[in-house]
Each structure stands twice: as C-alpha cells, then as structure tokens.
C-alpha cells in the first residue's frame, strides 16, 4: 500500500498539483508524506476506519516484511514533529497490542524498535518505563532466539536514551535494572550471546546500579572466557573488562582505581600461570609474576591431556584479550599501568620459539598453538602502546628489538613456496608491521626505527623481503649430456645454449593454481610501516638505507606500471600498489640529507600512476603530483624572496631619510636573497659608459664577503682605477671614477636589486659634474654559505650599500649592496677591502650608488639615502642626490638596525666628528682640509671639488693598480681595462682611498668611527701616504678587529669574515665601536677625505695593498665608530 500512497494522482490533475487527489503541496509535502507512511504501515498491521489507505492484506502476512518496512520508514524520517504525534500514538497502541500476544510479539517488537529510536523526547519519557517492562516480559518468556535478539537490541537503545535523562536514569537504576539483569542471567544457553549483549548494555550505561551483582556477573563472564564461539568469547572479555567500574565510588571497600589495578595484576598473575602450564619444561628461565595479583579461580578442566592444552589455550587467549581491553578501554578515573610487568609477560611469550619445544609427546600440539599465543602477545603490545603512548619511549630499545626478533622467529619456510601461494606466518608478520606503524605514529622520530644497529638492519631486511615480489624459480641448466650441470665442453663451433629448468613440481604460470592476491596483506602492511617510518624518521635514517630503498622502489614502480610483476605478485592488489606509491612519496618528502630524493623519476611515476585502473590509486597519484608540484614550483614565492628588497623609490630628506628607509620591512624583503650568488642581471641603466672589465657573472660570488687572503683573487669587477678588484679588496667609491663604478653596476644592478628593475637614471645636474658616475663592483668567484645568511636587519658593519646615481659621491665603500628595486644613479662599487673586512662590504653594489668616488662632500639633494642606511656606511658621500630614491637606491644588506636607529641621532655628532677629522687631515695635507670644508658644504662646493676629485682619482687609480699588482694581481686582471670614471666627486681624496676605503668615509660619523678603531689598533704602516693618520689607525683597528674575532691568523680571519658577514659586523663593532649610522647630512666625501688624509702619511709607508685592505676594513667599523677613531689615529 505504500506504493499506492506514493503513486501519482489520478487523471485530471497534474502530479503534485495542490488540488489533485493524492497530490502534496510543496509546503506540506514532507509532514503529510510522513503521516501517510505511518498510517500505511498501521494499515498493513491492522485495518483502521477512516484511513486514507484501505486494508488489502491481513496483518499476519506482512510480518516477514516488517523489519524492512521499519528501515524504510527510518529513511523517510517518519517520527518527530507534532504533526505525527497522532500517527505515532496509533503505532504505540498497535505495538502494545502485538506485544501482548505470543503470535504477534515479533511484529510488536518491530514497531517498538521504530518508536524507541524515532519518538520525540516527550513521547519517550512517557512510555519508556512501560516499554522496559514489556522487554523484561519478553526476556522472561524464553521466546525464540531471533525474538530474544531483537528484544535485547531494543533494550540497548532504551538504556542508551534513558541514561541521558536524569529522571529516567534514577528510576531505572533503582527499580528496574536489578530485575533486568536477573532476567538476562537466567536466559537459556541458546541465548547466551543475547544475554551478554544485554549485560554489556547494563554495565555500560548503568555501571553504578550493577555493583550489587558484580560477583555474579564476574563468574558469568569468566565462565564464557574459554568459549569456543569467538563472538561469545569476545563479548565475555568486553564485559569482564568493565567489572572494575561497577558500583559506586567504592565497590566492596575499594576505589575504582584500586579495583582496576587489582584486577589487572590478577590477570597478569593468571596469564603467567597459564603460560607455565602450556609450556612447562620448554622455557629455560621462565619469568614469574612478581605483582600483588591473585590468580583467578577458573573452572577445572578435564583430565584428557590434549583437551587440557586446548582449554588452557582458550583461557589464555580470553584473559589476554581482557587485559588488552582493560588497557584500551576508557576508564572514569586515572590509573597506574604496570608497564614493566606487562612487558615482562610479552617478552616471555615472544621468547618461546619452535627451537625450545620438544617435538615428542605434546610438543607438536604446543608448536601448533604457539603462533596464536604470539599474536595475543602482539595484540597486548599494541594495546599497551595505545594506552601509554610516548611515555613508553624509555622502553623503545626493547620494542625495537622485539619486532625483528618475532620476524626472525616466523621467517622459516617462506621462500620454499611457489608464487601464487600464501606464505606461512603472514598473519604474524602483518601484525608486527602494524605495530611498527603504530609505534612510529605514536612516537615519531623518537621511536628510533631503522636508525642503525643490528635490530634496525634485521628489520629492514625483513621489510625489503616482504615488499619484493616473488620471482618464479627458474634455473639455468646445461643440456642433458652434461653430467656436472655445467656447460658441455665441445667444439667451439657448436656452442650449446642454456635452457630454463623449471623443476619437476613447478609448472608454467598459466598452468598453475594460485591466488593472484597471495601475500598482499603482509606486503601492504610492510609498505605502510616502512612509509610511515621514512616519513617520520627519514632524515635520521642512514644514507645507505635510503639508497637501498631507491634501488628497490623505483624499478618496482616502473615494473608494476609496465605489468612486468603482476603475474602472481601481491601487487595485483590495488592496496599494495597504493602503499607502494605512498612509500615513494615518503622518500621524496623526508629524504636523507646526504642522499637526494629521486624527484624526476617520482614525478614520472606519479604521472603514469594517474592512469591506474583503481580509482583510489590514481587519485593518490594525482594528489602526490600536486604535493610535489607545490614543493618544486610554488605558486607563491617564498617569503624571503618575495617582493623587491626596497620599497618604491620615494624622495627623502637627505639627512633624516635613512632612518625611515631602514624600516624593517625594507630589510626583510629582498636584500637577503640578493646576497646570494648574483647572476649577472640585465644591465642597470647607468649614466656613463660601462667598461667591460670583469665578467658580470662574478657578481654571483659577490655575496660572500670574507678576507681576501684566504681566497684566490676573485675575477670580479675592476676597481675605479681599472684594476680588477680581488674578492677581498674593494676600492672606496670616492676613488672610483663614476663611469667604471657603473661598469659592474649596469650588469649586476638588477640582480642585486630585489625588484630586479634597473635603477632610474638621475638628472645630470643631481650628479657630480652633471654626469652620473658608475660604481665599480667587486665580484667574488666563490660564494660562502654565511654570505647567503646575511640579512638586511643584521647588525654587522659589513653591508652592501646601493646608492642611487643621483647621490653625491658615495663614500661608503663598505657596502656595494645591490641596488634596491630601481636605484636611479649608477651603482658604485665598494672599494677594495683589506682581507679581513673585505667580505663585509664586498657585496657588489649594482644599486645606483652615486659616483663611486663618493668622497665629495655634496650631500646635496637626497644625500641621505636614508632607507638602506647607507649613511652608516658612507651614505653621505654616496647618497647625495636621491633622497627620493632611498628605498630603491640604497640597500644595506648587512647593515644593522641599531645603526639605522642611531643614524638620526648621530648625524649631528658625525658632522662634528667629520669636521674634527678634516681639521686633522688639514694638518696632514691642505688639500684634504679643503676637501673637508667642501664636504661640509656638500652641494655648494660640490662642483668645485670635482676637478680635485678627478686628479685624486687618477692618483688613486695608480695606487690601486700598484696595490692590486702586489697583493691582488690575479684579481686585478679583471677590470684593469675599465676606463676611469669621467666624473669624480671634487672632494675625493687621492690614491690613499683604496686602502682607506670610503665605506667608513661615506659619512663623517663613519670616519670618526673608523678613526676610533684605528686609534685603538694604532696607526697602520701599510696605509697609503695619501690617507690621513686617522684612517691608518682605523685600518689597523679593522685588521685587529678581524683578528680578535677570529683566533686564527689575519688571513684566516679574513676568510671567516668573508664567509660569515656577521663576524664582520662584530669586527666592525669592535673597531668602529658605534653602529650609529652617520647622518646622511654629513657628506660621505668629507669622511673619505678625512680618512684619506689621516692615512696618507702612514699609508705611504705601508704597502698599497695593505693600505687598501686596512682602509676597507676600517670603513665598516667606522660606520659604527664615529669620532673616537680619529683621536687614536692621531
């Protein structure tokens, strides 16, 4: 009749039309449909007057279909809602009527099952007690097993819902549960399984109310522990494991926790006793239970020896399951687990092997039972791992030894079978691999699996054996005539061919009976355990293990895809193929640090795996490809390399802009990436012609800033003099002619600039002499790892500074940092730095550093270049023109945040210090003194100083050439041919600058700082004669600083500094003492001049090379140490 109700309306009205007979409106279709369905079922059981559906069959004929009808009604969600209360009430009446009759009891229970699950709360509370009474009557009636089973299922639902309602919970606990348990205990043996189901529901939902019957329940459960029915035995174990929670807080004078622990110890004692009975005289040193537990009183067994062993085995199995369930089941209170005692039992069981069993008498029977006992022990170990988790790590070594021990015990006879047959002991090995996966899943890399040792090697051997597909036993044999099985010796003209001997018992694969999925379970378990271990412990696994896995997995995947191993191998199963791909992905995601992952081969394999017949396998391969693609080709660039290092160029006031430019965001973006080896990017726009001195490719090595002596002369860009600048030495920008400075910058600027855009050119009027000088870049052949680690936010004096072309001469030789996004002026190359601190500022400054000879005082225009904080490294000299371009033009890769913060504060101090330094230099040389005054005036005297700067540049070039020829001849070859930059800032000091290295000079404060270190170190005899005495001390101080940080000789120190810019920073800090960035207002040219004047007399005495090195080293510390250096120098 339900079909008739759901059928369409009669002709004359469209289906579903509101007015059609039988039609359901859209608004009320759901409730009305449910009502019609309920009435339809009621009509099937008993005709009802006024029903929309007329009865067609007697109710009894529908009895066999009622369970299915109840399921269909649940699918429609018939119950619930006020609209259905009337229909549900009718069903309640029908159910009660049918339950009262023996003939219709089953139909009444079917209706009651629907009512209990679908009735609303009010209806359930109203009828729950009456339904419980009806169920109890059914249990006492000793009806047929199907009826009893349905009644117990309804009882379980009733107790589950009633336990959620406090009123019903109290009522049932006090008045009804004792009678229900008594009825369940009295069921006949045929209904024992139903009785155990009902008892399990009672002890689960009403544990306190069951406490008064705890003794009877325990006896009932124990008597069923050795049942031969697996389902009955499992139910008895589950019920017994819940006994400790029965009763109130105190059960028979014991707390729940104490009761649980006592029960656990009793189980352990009983298991030890049973094990001793099973394998008496087979254990060499049996472990006895030392716990406080008392052995359980089990029913006596029969006298027959064979039967006794089987009954003992059943009891042992049941008690072991009870122990595992107690460990894995939830308990209402925290308890203490005797881990050591449980592990002792497990080790005792697993320690019994076939070698210990005497095959006489009952030995074969004991040997037959042994695998089952080992499985019980492994289940117990699994439950213990789940219960205790990572707290078992102290026993990790024991667990790591147990697994390969069990595999060794059950590995005999596995290779003698032909393909297509299940190997023996596969179930035990599957369980071992499942425990391996669980142990690694719980403890991660701390599990220590496959990380060396004899146990790890043994485990790996078993894993590879179970993963490898079996091979048909084909042997090469000689012709029949050969007696020794070797090749027949005969005429050389008639060689004999080897033939395949398949053996007598081995037929061709097409003629053999076999299981195509044989050993698929153990193979899949081994693959899962191995893939989990590699994924969690891959980097800790030995390199040799990774290579062995690569050699096995990659060819196996290819063979599976080509169908070469699918004949009778476990890889016929899609589950094994899926786990094989999962293992391949784990090898990619967690490779060994010394063994590269097989990425290209894996990508090919995953691509082909997408065409697998199994949807599960193909879907996993697609997901693996997505994962690999995200790793190899990220759609979003990594954070460190994303975005330009410098913000868009913006005009900034010359003196104060540097601090703002140094915003952390600027440092974070691009400078770090640029520090790494810099491939020569597109040429950076430069004002002057770019001489082809050194290969731009050398710029890649630029990032590494280490002492030159340690490295072979880098073939990097030529200095301003046209000499190739060795990787260790950089020429001060003031000394470098603008055109040559641009030489390297044009090629490297894009690379150095995070944005990769060439720096915009600055109007000629903003540059010195109306033309844009080009900075010379120092390129290093070798890139140090520490160089890559240099960050924009580092506090080191070693920094790469990119100055816009528009800036006045960029005195800061220390930083030849790549220009940020698009520096305007041609980049200036940092002056050659002494071996010690050379690395700090070597970062090529492709950025538009103002004329590499930044010594000219003109701070005019955006002299400050504040953003990159070139100021601390000589921004005043180089940052004259581009206050607006600070963000893009000046990048201080190694600059420190402290210097940036202190720049503004020290700007005034640096100016004063520069003035003092200039006065001292005036005493040494009148030209330098005039240059100092010009630097103070910067913009006003800028043009006048250009002529002097050009002359000085020529002298400096000559000195630099000599210096490079002496020490850096190899490096000097690169850019000697470079034409001297046409435009030099007027205030550039003469040839001494290479040694003085304007890095400290860029800002007067830096010069002071350099002078302070110099004073500490003492005057350096190596400084060029043109350099002021202050510069010499600073250079020596720099050298001392390089030496002090590194215990090794100065060359070693230089190498260390070049490799690790942070060490350079420290040196700079020591030498400079002040990381305060010199104010952009102070002309970098002034600083450079002062340094050159101070170092000039001493520099003449020193070797030109040594002077250049010392000067370059002094520059970074000078940035940090403002005026104090000058006094010591003097």
Swiss-Prot record:
A motif (LXXLL motif 1) lies at residues 33-37. A motif (LXXLL motif 11) lies at residues 585-589. GO terms for biological process: cellular response to estrogen stimulus; positive regulation of transcription by RNA polymerase II; rRNA processing. A motif (LXXLL motif 4) lies at residues 155-159. It comes from the Eukaryota. Residues 694-704 have a biased composition (Polar residues). The modification Phosphothreonine is found at residue 757. Residues 786-798, 896-967 have a biased composition (Acidic residues). The modification N-acetylalanine is found at residue 2. Residues 7-16 have a biased composition (Low complexity). The Glu-rich region mediates histones interaction. The Leu-Xaa-Xaa-Leu-Leu (LXXLL) motifs are required for the association with nuclear receptor ESR1. This is Proline-, glutamic acid- and leucine-rich protein 1. It comes from Rattus norvegicus. The lineage of its organism: Eukaryota, Metazoa, Chordata, Craniata, Vertebrata. The gene is Pelp1.
């Amino acid at each position: 009749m339900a079909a008739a109700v759901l059928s369409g309306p009669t002709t004359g009205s469209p289906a579903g039309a509101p007015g059609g007979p039988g039609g359901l409106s859209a608004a009320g279709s759901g409730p009305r449909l449910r009502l019609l369905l309920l009435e339809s079922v009621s009509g099937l059981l008993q005709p009802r007057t006024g029903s929309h559906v007329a009865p067609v069959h007697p109710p009894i004929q529908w009895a066999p279909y009622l369970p299915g009808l109840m399921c269909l009604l649940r699918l429609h969600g018939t119950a619930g809602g006020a609209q259905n209360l009337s229909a549900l009430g009718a069903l309640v009446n029908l159910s009660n009527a049918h339950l009262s009759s023996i003939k219709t009891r089953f139909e009444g229970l079917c209706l009651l099952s629907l009512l209990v699950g679908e009735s609303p709360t009010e209806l359930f509370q109203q009828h729950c007690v009456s339904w419980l009474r009806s169920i109890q009557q059914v249990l006492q009636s000793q009806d047929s097993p199907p009826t009893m089973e349905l009644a117990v299922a309804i009882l379980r639902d009733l107790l589950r819902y009633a336990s959620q309602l406090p009123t019903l919970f109290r009522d049932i606990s006090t008045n009804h549960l004792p009678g229900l348990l008594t009825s369940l205990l009295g069921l006949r043996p045929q209904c024992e399984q139903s009785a155990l189901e009902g008892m399990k529901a009672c002890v689960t939902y009403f544990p306190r109310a069951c406490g008064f019957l705890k003794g009877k329940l325990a006896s009932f459960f124990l008597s069923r522990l050795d049942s031969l029915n697996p389902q009955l035995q499992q139910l008895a174990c589950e019920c017994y494991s819940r006994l400790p929670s029965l009763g109130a807080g105190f059960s028979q004078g014991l707390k729940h926790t104490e009761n649980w622990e006592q029960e656990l110890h009793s189980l352990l004692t009983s298991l030890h006793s049973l094990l001793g009975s099973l394998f008496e005289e087979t254990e060499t040193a049996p472990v006895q239970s030392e716990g406080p537990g008392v052995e359980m009183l089990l029913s006596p067994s029969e006298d027959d020896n064979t039967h006794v062993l089987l009954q003992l085995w059943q009891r042992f199995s049941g008690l072991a399951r009870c122990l595992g369930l107690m460990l894995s089941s939830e308990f209402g209170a925290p308890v203490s687990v005797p881990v050591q005692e449980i592990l002792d039992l497990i080790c005792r069981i697993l320690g019994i092997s076939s070698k210990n069993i005497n095959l006489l008498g009952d030995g074969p029977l004991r040997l037959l039972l042994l695998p089952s006992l080992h499985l019980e022990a492994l289940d117990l170990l699994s439950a213990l791992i789940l219960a205790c988790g990572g707290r078992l790590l102290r026993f990790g070594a024991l667990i790591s030894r147990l697994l390969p021990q069990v595999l060794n015990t059950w590995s005999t006879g596995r290779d003698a079978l032909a393909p297509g047959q299940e190997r023996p002991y596969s179930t035990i090995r599957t369980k071992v691999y499942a425990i391996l996966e669980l142990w690694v899943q719980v403890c991660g890399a701390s599990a220590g699996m496959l990380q060396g040792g004899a146990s790890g090697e043994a485990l790996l051997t078993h894993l590879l054996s179970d993963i490898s597909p079996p091979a048909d036993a084909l042997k090469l044999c000689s012709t029949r005539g050969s007696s020794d099985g070797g090749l027949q010796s005969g005429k050389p003209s008639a060689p004999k061919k080897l033939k395949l001997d398949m053996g007598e018992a081995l037929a061709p694969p097409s003629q053999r009976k076999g299981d195509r999925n044989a050993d698929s379970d153990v193979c899949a378990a081994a693959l899962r355990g191995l893939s989990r271990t590699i994924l969690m412990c891959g980097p800790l696994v030995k390199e040799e293990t990774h290579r062995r896995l690569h050699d096995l997995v990659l060819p196996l995947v290819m063979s599976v895809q080509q169908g070469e191993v699918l004949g009778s191998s476990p890889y016929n199963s899609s589950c094994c193929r899926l786990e094989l791909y999962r293992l391949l992905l784990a090898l990619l995601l967690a490779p060994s640090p010394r063994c590269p992952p097989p990425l290209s081969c894996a990508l090919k394999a995953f691509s082909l795996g997408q065409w697998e017949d199994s949807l599960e396998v193909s879907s996993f391969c697609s997901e693996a490809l997505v994962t690999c693609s995200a790793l190899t080709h990220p759609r979003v660039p990594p954070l460190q390399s994303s975005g330009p290092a410098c913000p868009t160029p913006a005009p900034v006031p010359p003196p104060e802009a540097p601090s703002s430019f140094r915003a952390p965001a600027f440092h974070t973006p691009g400078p770090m990436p640029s520090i790494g080896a810099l491939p020569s990017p597109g040429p950076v726009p430069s004002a002057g012609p770019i001489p082809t001195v050194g290969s731009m490719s050398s710029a890649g090595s630029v990032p590494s800033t280490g002492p030159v002596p340690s490295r072979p002369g880098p073939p990097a860009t030529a200095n301003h003099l046209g000499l190739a600048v060795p990787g260790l030495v950089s020429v001060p920008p003031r000394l470098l002619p603008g055109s040559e400075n641009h030489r390297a910058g044009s090629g490297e600027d894009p690379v150095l600039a995070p944005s990769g855009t060439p720096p915009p050119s600055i109007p000629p009027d903003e540059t010195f002499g109306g033309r844009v000088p080009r900075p010379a870049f120092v390129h290093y052949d070798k890139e140090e790892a520490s160089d890559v680690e240099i960050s924009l936010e580092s506090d080191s004096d070693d920094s790469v500074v990119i100055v816009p072309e528009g800036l006045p001469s960029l005195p800061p030789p220390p930083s030849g940092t790549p220009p940020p996004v698009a520096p305007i002026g041609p980049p200036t190359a940092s002056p050659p730095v002494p071996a010690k601190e050379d690395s700090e500022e070597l970062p090529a400054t492709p950025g538009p550093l103002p004329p590499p000879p930044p010594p000219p005082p003109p701070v005019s225009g955006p002299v400050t270049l504040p953003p990159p904080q070139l100021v601390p490294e000589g921004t005043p000299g180089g940052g004259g023109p581009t206050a607006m371009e600070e963000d893009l033009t000046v990048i201080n890769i190694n600059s420190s945040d402290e210097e940036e913060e202190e720049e503004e504060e020290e700007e005034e101090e640096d100016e004063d210090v520069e003035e003092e330094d200039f006065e001292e230099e005036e005493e040494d040389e009148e030209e330098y003194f005039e240059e100092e005054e010009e630097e103070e005036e910067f913009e006003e005297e800028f043009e006048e100083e250009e002529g002097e700067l050009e002359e000085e540049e020529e002298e400096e070039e000559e000195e630099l050439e000599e210096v490079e020829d002496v020490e850096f001849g190899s490096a000097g070859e690169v850019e000697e041919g470079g034409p001297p930059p046409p435009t030099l800032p007027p205030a550039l000091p003469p040839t001494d600058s290479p040694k003085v290295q304007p890095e400290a000079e860029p800002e007067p404060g830096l010069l002071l700082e350099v002078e302070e270190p110099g004073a500490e170190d003492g005057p350096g005899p190596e400084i060029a004669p043109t350099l002021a005495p202050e510069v010499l001390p600073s250079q020596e101080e720099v050298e001392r600083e390089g030496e002090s940080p590194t215990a090794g000789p100065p060359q070693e120190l230089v190498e260390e500094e070049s490799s690790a810019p942070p060490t350079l920073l420290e040196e700079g800090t020591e030498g400079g003492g002040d990381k305060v960035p010199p104010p952009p207002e102070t002309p970098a040219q002034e600083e450079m001049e002062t340094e050159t004047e101070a170092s000039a007399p001493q520099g003449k005495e020193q070797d030109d090379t040594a002077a250049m090195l010392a000067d370059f080293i002094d520059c970074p510390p000078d940035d940090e140490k403002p005026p104090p250096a000058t006094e010591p120098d003097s």
